[in-house]
């Protein structure tokens, strides 16, 4: 929950680093593997420059998720994440957005008995382009170091910081990136489809095991029907492939179905 007043947002809301209006509609709750879809406590200010431009700056409390190894320990995070973005909205309702984030992630080096900070950072670009009155293209790409918490597929599993290869108590912020693209087509006022492809990648594993996540691909297609003003039903096919650093991989296919009624 959050409250808004004169451009300020206080409470738990979607991260300022992301762009939820560029995320494609899926039945799958997780959505694209590279999506930036996280809600966190924040204080945000949004400034409407004019009818076309707006910008936001925030302080957000994010739970760092890192792997300590044998010679490091987790500590309480003292510095909030600082994301910002700027958006341009076109006359036809299309928009593009760019954003950046700065993180200071604290941990304890047990060998040196000293608290340390690693700086994480990230940049992103996203948008929704209305190609015709019934077809839109949605996209997003991001790159950074120490921003695993923000990337859907690797959020919360210990990749914001990882032990260095020598595991001497130092942690590093590995590079990571992702992208997705999706077409959404309205067949008529009540029937629509989305086709999505997404890719997410971790660039280094430090001293983590060989079965650590390296990259994954995600693809899906659906057909949704708004059978009333408040009701939606649909069916969806999703395919996923994960590759590890040791070259092991796995594929999975799934059929999702949904009936939703909004009160």
For the regions a protein language model found, what residue spans apply to each?
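Surface-exposed loop and membrane-interface regions of Gram-negative outer-membrane beta-barrel proteins
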Residues: 1-4, 17-31, 68-72, 107-115, ...
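Outer membrane beta-barrel
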Residues: 1-65, 78, 83, 87-91, ...
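Outer-membrane beta-barrel architecture
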Residues: 2, 44-46, 85-87, 124-128, ...
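Repeated loop/turn-to-beta-strand initiation elements of outer-membrane beta-barrel proteins
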Residues: 6-10, 51-57, 93-97, 134-137, ...
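Transmembrane beta-strands of outer-membrane beta-barrel pores
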Residues: 7, 12-16, 59-65, 90, ...
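Residues that define the transmembrane beta-barrel architecture of outer-membrane proteins
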Residues: 37-41, 78-82, 117-123, 173-177, ...
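Detector for outer-membrane/organellar transmembrane beta-barrel domains
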Residues: 89-207, 212-213
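Outer-membrane beta-barrel "beta-signal"
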Residues: 225-227, 250-263
């Amino acid at each position: 929950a959050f409250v808004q007043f004169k451009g300020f947002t206080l409470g738990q809301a979607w991260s300022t680093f992301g762009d939820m209006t560029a995320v494609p509609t899926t039945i799958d709750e997780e959505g694209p593997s590279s999506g930036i879809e996280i809600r966190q406590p924040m204080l945000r200010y949004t400034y409407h420059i004019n009818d076309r431009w707006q910008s936001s700056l925030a302080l957000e409390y994010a739970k760092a998720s890192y792997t300590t190894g044998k010679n490091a320990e987790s500590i309480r995070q003292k510095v909030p994440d600082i994301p910002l973005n700027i958006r341009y909205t076109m006359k036809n309702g299309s928009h593009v957005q760019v954003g950046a984030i700065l993180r200071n992630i604290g941990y304890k080096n047990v060998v040196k008995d000293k608290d340390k900070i690693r700086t994480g950072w990230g940049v992103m670009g996203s948008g929704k382009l209305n190609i015709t009155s019934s077809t839109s293209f949605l996209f997003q790409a991001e790159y950074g170091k120490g921003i695993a918490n923000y990337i859907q597929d690797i959020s919360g599993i210990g990749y914001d910081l990882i032990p260095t290869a020598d595991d001497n108590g130092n942690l590093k912020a590995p590079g990571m990136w992702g992208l997705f693209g999706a077409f959404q087509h309205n067949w008529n006022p009540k029937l629509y489809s989305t086709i999505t492809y997404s890719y997410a990648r971790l660039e280094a594993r430090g001293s983590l095991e060989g079965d650590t996540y390296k990259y994954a691909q995600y693809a899906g297609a659906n057909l949704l029907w708004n059978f009333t003003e408040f009701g939606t039903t649909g069916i969806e096919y999703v395919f996923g492939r994960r590759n590890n650093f040791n070259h092991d991989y796995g594929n999975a296919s799934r059929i999702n179905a949904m009936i939703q009624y909004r009160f």
